[in-house]
């Protein structure tokens, strides 16, 4: 048997990591990157460089390569595609053997795929557009603590989306006044209320005081309405120890659901908290604070659909997804694409919705999509048409901004939702007939009538920054 000779020096990445003949294995983790190379760096070399730097490569040949099977462990750039309307960038498809990654560790996957390679000088900009997690890897992750069906059973709510509200002002209220707002919203007809993402434990409202007043509000509202209620108590904290202390106290108070800011808190903390929630029977609401820092630039960063997949693997029962019709970024096709990635067991490749790979989730539970941000009663027909039943519609200002107060705002939203669900079940076109559906419902609901008058002129007519690059294949 001939001995492979070690040859020192620097060689082009394409010699090792460009493999257009490679057929990805079912067990490979596949990634699609949008690459904008530096002037003078051709596509194959740039794609191979990304494959190398995100897997086994370094800038020079090293003799220790001979101590392992580099052909097995290396990432392979196996396909390149044009980006429609952009002649400076291209899509590179890279396959990684599953054994490069620790089982069940979103942390480890991201450390490789979006690690040092994003500072690599050979590329001017780099964006991770999509990742295919093979079923063999999905099964190593715990996923959502409970999922959609179990949450419906716990909350005893079926046949419609859930209604929520983020308490406003998000900062500055005392714990007692905060609890009062929670009670009024839940008594008025909402299923959930919510801490905003930056409500932790500030001088004006320490976390323990907030938890106590909120628990009292929930128990009182449940007794008065006969319905199960919840409030997303944010347990995000400066350290894991403090996070678990807050979660444990929420459990002591018999709170059904807690909340975590999964990006600012980190995937390690989130996965640990999701496992705790599964063990204790606690639901977990996930906020995506900080996502736009990494996903809004269409040329550099990580697309939100990748963060969606990562969250489903790491664990959460709810995730904020944008609204399409509200104040936050997100076009309809893309949003419905990542909502399916949250909820469905199998999602086929669909470039018209920005989905680059088939994604098989096996039996992993789905996650409720949370529509939140600048929505009000006039949006209800479109929200139901876009998101369907397995969603939470959260009206912050659209509840608390009602001229008659919080309970009236909650009642208006509940009446609007139930009218739209009834119309949908009758086969009516929600988006075409939405105005008639709401105005007819308002004849028997003065709260809804006032809400419709208050927000009839409110629109968010801004174009989406991150547009789909639809590939004609």
Swiss-Prot record:
Q: Does the keyword Membrane apply?
A: no
Q: How is the cofactor bound?
A: Binds 1 Mg(2+) ion per subunit.
Q: Where are the transmembrane segments?
A: none
Query: GO molecular function: any one?
Result: ribulose-bisphosphate carboxylase activity
Q: Does the keyword Hydrolase apply?
A: no
Query: Site feature Transition state stabilizer: at which residues?
Result: 327
**GO BP annotations listed:** reductive pentose-phosphate cycle
Residue sites binding Mg(2+) per the record: 194, 196-197
InterPro entries documented for this protein:
RuBisCO, RuBisCo_large_chain_AS, RuBisCO_lsu_C, RuBisCO_lsu_C_sf, RuBisCO_lsu_fd_N, RuBisCO_lsu_N_sf, RuBisCO_lsuI
Q: What class of enzyme is it?
A: lyase
Q: Which reaction does it catalyse?
A: 2 (2R)-3-phosphoglycerate + 2 H(+) = D-ribulose 1,5-bisphosphate + CO2 + H2O; D-ribulose 1,5-bisphosphate + O2 = 2-phosphoglycolate + (2R)-3-phosphoglycerate + 2 H(+)
One Pfam short name: RuBisCO_large
Q: Which residues carry this modification: N6-carboxylysine?
A: 194
Cofactor(s) required for function per UniProt:
Mg(2+)
> What PROSITE patterns is this protein classified in?
RUBISCO_LARGE (PS00157)
Q: What does this protein do?
A: RuBisCO catalyzes two reactions: the carboxylation of D-ribulose 1,5-bisphosphate, the primary event in carbon dioxide fixation, as well as the oxidative fragmentation of the pentose substrate. Both reactions occur simultaneously and in competition at the same active site.
For this chain, the family text in UniProt reads: Belongs to the RuBisCO large chain family. Type I subfamily.
Any further remark recorded for this protein: The basic functional RuBisCO is composed of a large chain homodimer in a 'head-to-tail' conformation. In form I RuBisCO this homodimer is arranged in a barrel-like tetramer with the small subunits forming a tetrameric 'cap' on each end of the 'barrel'.
Quaternary structure, from the entry = Heterohexadecamer of 8 large chains and 8 small chains.
Q: What is this protein called?
A: Ribulose bisphosphate carboxylase large chain 1
The record lists the organism as: Acidithiobacillus ferrooxidans (strain ATCC 23270 / DSM 14882 / CIP 104768 / NCIMB 8455) (Ferrobacillus ferrooxidans (strain ATCC 23270))
Q: Lineage of the native species?
A: Bacteria, Pseudomonadati, Pseudomonadota, Acidithiobacillia, Acidithiobacillales
């Amino acid at each position: 048997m001939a001995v492979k000779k070690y040859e020192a020096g620097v060689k082009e990445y394409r010699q090792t990591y460009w493999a257009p003949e490679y057929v990805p294995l079912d067990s490979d983790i596949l990634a699609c990157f949008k690459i904008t190379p530096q002037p003078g760096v051709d596509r194959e070399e740039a794609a191979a460089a990304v494959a190398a730097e995100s897997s086994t490569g370094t800038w020079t040949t090293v003799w220790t390569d001979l101590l392992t099977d580099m052909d097995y462990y290396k990432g392979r750039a196996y396909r390149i595609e044009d980006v429609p309307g952009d002649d400076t960038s291209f899509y590179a498809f890279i396959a990684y053997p599953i054994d490069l990654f620790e089982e069940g560790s979103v942390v480890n996957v991201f450390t490789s795929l979006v690690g040092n390679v994003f500072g690599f000088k050979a590329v001017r900009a780099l964006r991770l557009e999509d990742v295919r997690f093979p079923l063999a890897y999905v099964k190593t992750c715990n996923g959502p603590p409970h999922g959609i069906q179990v949450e419906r059973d716990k909350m005893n709510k079926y046949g419609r989306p859930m209604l929520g509200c983020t308490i406003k002002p998000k900062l500055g209220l005392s714990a007692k006044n905060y609890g009062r707002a929670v009670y009024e919203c839940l008594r008025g007809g909402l299923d959930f209320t919510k801490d905003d993402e930056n409500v932790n434990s500030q001088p004006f409202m320490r976390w323990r005081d907030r938890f106590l007043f909120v628990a009292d509000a929930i128990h009182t509202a449940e007794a008065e309405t006969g319905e199960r209620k919840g409030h997303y108590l944010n347990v995000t904290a400066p350290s894991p120890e403090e996070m678990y202390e807050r979660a444990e106290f929420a459990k002591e108070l018999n709170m059904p659901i807690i909340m975590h800011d999964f990006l600012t808190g980190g995937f390690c903390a989130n996965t640990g908290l999701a496992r705790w929630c599964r063990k204790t029977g606690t639901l977990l609401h996930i906020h995506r604070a900080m996502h736009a820092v990494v996903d809004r630039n269409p040329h550099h960063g990580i697309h939100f659909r990748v963060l969606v997949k990562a969250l489903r693997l790491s664990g959460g029962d709810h995730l904020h997804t944008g609204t399409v019709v509200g104040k936050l970024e997100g076009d309809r096709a893309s949003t419905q694409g990542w909502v399916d990635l949250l909820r469905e067991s199998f999602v086929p490749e669909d470039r018209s919705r920005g989905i680059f790979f088939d994604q098989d989730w096996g039996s992993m539970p789905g996650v409720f999509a949370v529509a939140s941000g600048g929505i009000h009663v006039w949006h209800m027909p479109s929200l139901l048409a876009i998101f369907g039943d397995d969603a939470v519609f959260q009206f912050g200002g659209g509840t608390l901004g009602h001229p008659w107060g919080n309970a009236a705002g909650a009642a208006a939203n509940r009446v609007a939702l139930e009218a739209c669900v009834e119309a949908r079940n009758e086969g009516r076109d929600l988006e075409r007939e939405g105005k008639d559906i709401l105005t007819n419902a308002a004849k028997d609901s003065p709260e809804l009538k006032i809400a419709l008058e208050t927000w009839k002129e409110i629109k968010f007519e801004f174009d989406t920054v991150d547009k789909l690059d639809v590939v004609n294949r």
